[in-house]
Amino acid sequence: MTKSDETTATSLNAKTLKSFESTLPIPTYPREGVKQGIVHLGVGAFHRSHLAVFMHRLMQEHHLKDWSICGVGLMKADALMRDAMKAQDCLYTLVERGIKDTNAYIVGSITAYMYAPDDPRAVIEKMANPDTHIVSLTVTENGYYHSEATNSLMTDAPEIINDLNHPEKPDTLYGYLYEALLLRYKRGLTPFTIMSCDNMPQNGVTVKTMLVAFAKLKKDEKFAAWIEDKVTSPNSMVDRVTPRCTDKERKYVADTWGIKDQCPVVAEPFIQWVLEDNFSDGRPPWELVGVQVVKDVDSYELMKLRLLNGGHSAMGYLGYLAGYTYIHEVVNDPTINKYIRVLMREEVIPLLPKVPGVDFEEYTASVLERFSNPAIQDTVARICLMGSGKMPKYVLPSIYEQLRKPDGKYKLLAVCVAGWFRYLTGVDMNGKPFEIEDPMAPTLKAAAVKGGKDPHELLNIEVLFSPEIRDNKEFVAQLTHSLETVYDKGPIAAIKEILDQV
């Protein structure tokens, strides 16, 4: 039943919080005068539906103190989040939308927010403060400046060059991590743990390896060795579908609960976090709220990245070209649904190490069921974002592994890459242009347009593709054929043709 609307809804903040307790659950733990044990870089929707929720549960159900979160916006684009966090005292509404039921509550585990472009030094000092035990990250795959093809730091990126030469005003997470750890080092303090919460294979190992490479470029070998020896960075597997917030969600929260919230979060009910127990300066007891804290995350991580994220990307590019708006519509397309199931069964699952207690085909089916949730309204366009960071981590590794096998199978994987390449032209199948949101968009689009049905222009981008894939004549021939079919007949026809061959 509608209780309010946007004109009569009450703005959410610390002063009004109590007025909502008869409508939905609110934080009952103290939020003032508590220490922030975690500094989180990159406060987007996913962080607020995942790590912040686990911390909220610990504070709400187990009365944990001094582990609240100080959020940090690194980019100029984070100004909108800064304004919302400031106006709302870092409170926000979380709406969990299932296929049948909806659950909502107010989250208060973020108790401070800093906007780095305004005062980078203040952020560095906050990270260096001994009360900070963990610096966590959700900066997207592109924020790591890691080339999957060369397994190295992108040292020619302008932002990395800036951070090497202008430590007083960093652009990347490495500039901030380096300067903050340097202060801890000079002050004789234990280093904080760097905890990546991004969807990447070996996310913890990757961020630490890239940070050490960055430190070595700064020509302080002793400090670089200290980072390598003392700083911990656990691997993790994170999972929760969390679409971008739009005015539609803001209106829904206002109409349903009478809350005027500038930054609500809508997510699926499912939530999972598998975390390596590797911390240098303590950690909260996450096991109490359902986090799987384990010795080795690798098998869980590969399963999720290859099956869920890889499947997501395949559905995204092919579904976009097929004219779909929402992911649940793509899942309900019988041809694409069958394609994802066969792709996983034939070309991805055989490459995966076993995960205790998990049947991979059942996992794939559960993923498709989650994606079919129409209440989430997850857009295909969102899934297509930042492909240069996603495809080399979610899809291309399976191709590399198949190419190394004498009887390697990759026809279905090639269709996914063909869909991505056709998408990168920035023009849909009806000739309508659209914007490609990707840090490499100008380079990718120029190569896609120039190459057309010939994939070589894109394959020659060395930061994305290694010679192993670029010089494999059989794979390139298969990719070329799939790309031609997508261009000439459309994505559904290309999928059907390949399904008939496997």
From Swiss-Prot:
GO terms for biological process: mannitol metabolic process. It catalyses: D-mannitol + NAD(+) = D-fructose + NADH + H(+). InterPro entries: 6-PGluconate_DH-like_C_sf (IPR008927), 6PGD_dom2 (IPR013328), Mannitol_DH (IPR000669), Mannitol_DH/Oxidoreductase (IPR050988), Mannitol_DH_C (IPR013118), Mannitol_DH_CS (IPR023027), Mannitol_DH_N (IPR013131), NAD(P)-bd_dom_sf (IPR036291). Disruption phenotype: Rescues temperature-sensitivity of MPT5 deletion. GO terms for molecular function: mannitol 2-dehydrogenase activity; mannitol dehydrogenase activity. Catalyzes the NAD(H)-dependent interconversion of D-fructose and D-mannitol in the mannitol metabolic pathway. There are two genes for this mannitol dehydrogenase in yeast, DSF1 and YNR073C. PANTHER family: MANNITOL DEHYDROGENASE 2-RELATED, MANNITOL DEHYDROGENASE DSF1-RELATED. This is Mannitol dehydrogenase DSF1. It comes from Saccharomyces cerevisiae (strain ATCC 204508 / S288c). The lineage of its organism: Eukaryota, Fungi, Dikarya, Ascomycota, Saccharomycotina.
